[in-house]
């Protein structure tokens, strides 16, 4: 079956891992405590703070304890959904203030634009929240790229290393798994997508190999029609 849709990871794929770890995470770590204290009563924030309490098994945790938990989770790089949501809110504030610009590799920008023009439906699947994904592409160094994408998926669709997550996403895309090309730099994610029936292509930007999958060093080398 010809490829009709392309589902891409962000970290290490469209964007530098260093942007996430050296720019976004430190920004969130620095600004999260004040943001939570300032906005704790707002419904959207309060909902996420309650989710932190539930996840930690500490239903009576006060705001300062919740902040301490969030900072622990950041240090551990935990993929906790409420942490991701709150980080997204802090990043949105930073992007809107012009303090942050999303990093997207130039080869990824060019390829995504080209594929969009060719009629491929483009989607994102990242461990970062959907809001954070939209900000990286909507406020990127290359301008607003959000119009290229038909949809975004995060860990609310399931863990990235489990095949069922990719089946769930294919259903949500209303597209047979065999018509979807998944791009990632993590072999376990590629394995899971492949097990769900998707075509896969690995991004090995620093060289190296991604065993069991076709892989390239740049988006410029990906031809969806060849899968």
Curated annotation (Swiss-Prot):
One example GO MF annotation: 2-hydroxy-3-keto-5-methylthiopentenyl-1-phosphate phosphatase activity
EC annotation from Swiss-Prot or TrEMBL: 3.1.3.77
Q: Pfam family of this protein, just one?
A: Hydrolase
Domain of life per record = Bacteria
Instruction: For this UniProt record, give its keywords in alphabetical order, as a comma-separated list.
Output: Amino-acid biosynthesis, Hydrolase, Magnesium, Metal-binding, Methionine biosynthesis
Give the note describing cofactor binding and stoichiometry. Answer: Binds 1 Mg(2+) ion per subunit.
Its BP terms in the Gene Ontology are: L-methionine salvage from methylthioadenosine
- Reactions it catalyzes: 5-methylsulfanyl-2,3-dioxopentyl phosphate + H2O = 1,2-dihydroxy-5-(methylsulfanyl)pent-1-en-3-one + phosphate
Q: Which cofactor does it need?
A: Mg(2+)
Q: Where, if anywhere, are coiled coils annotated? A: none
Q: Where are the transmembrane segments?
A: none
Kindly tell me the pathway this chain contributes to: Amino-acid biosynthesis; L-methionine biosynthesis via salvage pathway; L-methionine from S-methyl-5-thio-alpha-D-ribose 1-phosphate: step 3/6; Amino-acid biosynthesis; L-methionine biosynthesis via salvage pathway; L-methionine from S-methyl-5-thio-alpha-D-ribose 1-phosphate: step 4/6
Q: What does this protein do?
A: Bifunctional enzyme that catalyzes the enolization of 2,3-diketo-5-methylthiopentyl-1-phosphate (DK-MTP-1-P) into the intermediate 2-hydroxy-3-keto-5-methylthiopentenyl-1-phosphate (HK-MTPenyl-1-P), which is then dephosphorylated to form the acireductone 1,2-dihydroxy-3-keto-5-methylthiopentene (DHK-MTPene).
**Quaternary form?**
Monomer.
Q: PANTHER family, per this entry? A: ENOLASE-PHOSPHATASE E1
Q: Family, per the entry?
A: Belongs to the HAD-like hydrolase superfamily. MasA/MtnC family.
Q: What is this protein called?
A: Enolase-phosphatase E1
Gene designation: mtnC
């Amino acid at each position: 079956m010809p490829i009709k849709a392309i589902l891409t990871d962000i970290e290490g794929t469209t964007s530098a891992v260093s942007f996430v770890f050296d720019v976004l995470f430190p920004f969130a770590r620095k600004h999260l405590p004040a943001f939570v204290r300032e906005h704790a009563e707002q419904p959207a924030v309060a909902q996420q703070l309650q989710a932190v309490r539930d996840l930690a098994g500490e239903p009576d945790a006060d705001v300062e304890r919740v902040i301490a938990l969030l900072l622990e989770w950041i240090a551990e790089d935990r993929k906790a959904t409420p942490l991701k949501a709150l980080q997204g809110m802090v990043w949105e504030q930073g992007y809107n203030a012009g303090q942050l610009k999303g990093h997207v590799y130039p080869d990824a920008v060019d390829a995504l634009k080209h594929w969009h023009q060719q009629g491929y439906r483009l989607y994102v699947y990242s461990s970062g929240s959907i809001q954070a994904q939209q900000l990286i592409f909507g406020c990127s160094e290359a301008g607003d790229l959000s119009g290229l994408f038909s949809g975004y998926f995060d860990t609310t669709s399931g863990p990235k290393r489990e095949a069922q997550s990719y089946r769930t996403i294919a259903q949500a895309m209303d597209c047979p798994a065999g018509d979807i090309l998944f791009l990632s730099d993590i072999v376990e994610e590629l394995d899971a997508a492949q097990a769900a029936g998707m075509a896969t292509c690995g991004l090995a930007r620093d060289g190296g190999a991604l065993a069991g999958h076709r892989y390239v060093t740049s988006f410029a080398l990906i031809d969806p029609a060849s899968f």
